């Protein structure tokens, strides 16, 4: 089994558990160049807020490092709070809670999002 298939298997298990809980989820996706975050409903049918390093506010500097992930975390928290969302479940999409994923989560927490 390849590393990506193992990551997807872990992500599927977590998403099923979040669906059982019935809370909105903060989904994270990372590539070597960019970070993406979106808040979706528990069943994943509707996207409530998005942020990424491709946004105009964040595109200027480096986009694939920890500092960029922190900025994405702050931006997704601001947009989620503007949409009336205070509490979410963190879906790390099978990625290790380390580096850019951890930086995004910590920044979102500091900006007022609860998970």
From Swiss-Prot:
Keywords: Ribonucleoprotein, Ribosomal protein, RNA-binding, rRNA-binding. Pfam families: Ribosomal_L18p. The keyword Ribosomal protein applies. One of its GO terms (cellular component) is cytosolic large ribosomal subunit. One of its GO terms (molecular function) is 5S rRNA binding. CDD domains: Ribosomal_L18_L5e. Gene3D superfamilies: 3.30.420.100. GO terms for biological process: translation. Part of the 50S ribosomal subunit; part of the 5S rRNA/L5/L18/L25 subcomplex. Contacts the 5S and 23S rRNAs. Belongs to the universal ribosomal protein uL18 family. PANTHER family: 39S RIBOSOMAL PROTEIN L18, MITOCHONDRIAL, LARGE RIBOSOMAL SUBUNIT PROTEIN UL18M. This is one of the proteins that bind and probably mediate the attachment of the 5S RNA into the large ribosomal subunit, where it forms part of the central protuberance. This is Large ribosomal subunit protein uL18. It comes from Marinobacter nauticus (strain ATCC 700491 / DSM 11845 / VT8). The lineage of its organism: Bacteria, Pseudomonadati, Pseudomonadota, Gammaproteobacteria, Pseudomonadales.
